[in-house]
């Protein structure tokens, strides 16, 4: 009886067929995922420049906001702490100024102060739709000379550190030296106390018991050597 012979199929074709039957469908990549904005980041429609500014007090800084389209009004938001929500920035006349030219909006702050520290966001609201786009933010850090209160605080801190160092020196250097000196003095006193230890006072001879040494007569005359006869 003739047996049925299976046609030889390459193993890699079978593996590929099994993978196609068992694998989940892979979603097609969207065009916006393939072509990301090279100038910005996750804030797709608008981006800010620079992302961080550090200037001394009294300088003038500018923050730029670039947009894909010029349609819509641009406003600026500001928050001082990271965990706060951005609030509408109140422009001070003569010191803060905002300008918009087609796809570029600029915020200018003159004579920056410590109160201007924070993160600034540009926000665009389109005219045709209700969509609102917000930039990633620009952090401003104002640097300058310390105030009188800060100087006093630093001086107090320095005095405290010096006091702590002095106490540590006394504790770890001077105190051990005094302890060693005190130990040496006590050791010398103990040696003096043990000088007459074991001596029985009752058995010692008194002054009257001391026998007077009497010298005998000399057998040789002056000038004669004792070895001569």
UniProtKB/Swiss-Prot annotation:
GO cellular component: B cell receptor complex; external side of plasma membrane; extracellular exosome; IgM B cell receptor complex; plasma membrane
Residues in compartment: Cytoplasmic: 181-229
Subcellular location: Cell membrane
Keyword Transmembrane helix applies: yes
InterPro entries (UniProt xref): Ig-like_dom, Ig-like_dom_sf, Ig-like_fold, Ig_sub, Ig_V-set, Phos_immunorcpt_sig_ITAM
Tissue expression: B-cells.
Glycosylation (residues): 73, 101, 127-128
PTMs per UniProt: Phosphorylated on tyrosine upon B-cell activation by SRC-type Tyr-kinases such as BLK, LYN and SYK.
Coiled coil location: none
Principal location class: membrane
Residue ranges constituting the ITAM domain according to the UniProt record: 185-213
TM segment ranges: 160-180
This protein's UniProt keywords: Adaptive immunity, Cell membrane, Disease variant, Disulfide bond, Glycoprotein, Immunity, Immunoglobulin domain, Membrane, Phosphoprotein, Receptor, Signal, Transmembrane, Transmembrane helix
Domain Ig-like V-type, chain residue ranges per copy: 38-138
Phosphotyrosine: residues bearing it: 196, 207
Disulfide bonds: 43-126, 65-122
Record bears the keyword GTP-binding: no
Segments on the Extracellular side according to the record's topology features: 29-159
SUPFAM superfamilies named among the record's database cross-references: Immunoglobulin
Domain observations: The transmembrane helices of CD79A and CD79B chains and two IgM heavy chains assembly in a four-helix bundle structure that appears to be conserved among different BCR isotypes.
Task of the protein: Required in cooperation with CD79A for initiation of the signal transduction cascade activated by the B-cell antigen receptor complex (BCR) which leads to internalization of the complex, trafficking to late endosomes and antigen presentation. Enhances phosphorylation of CD79A, possibly by recruiting kinases which phosphorylate CD79A or by recruiting proteins which bind to CD79A and protect it from dephosphorylation.
Complex and partners: Heterodimer of alpha and beta chains; disulfide-linked. Part of the B-cell antigen receptor complex where the alpha/beta chain heterodimer is non-covalently associated with an antigen-specific membrane-bound surface immunoglobulin of two heavy chains and two light chains. Interacts with LYN.
Linked pathology: Agammaglobulinemia 6, autosomal recessive: A primary immunodeficiency characterized by profoundly low or absent serum antibodies and low or absent circulating B-cells due to an early block of B-cell development. Affected individuals develop severe infections in the first years of life.
Descriptive protein name: B-cell antigen receptor complex-associated protein beta chain
Origin species: Homo sapiens
Origin organism lineage: Eukaryota, Metazoa, Chordata, Craniata, Vertebrata
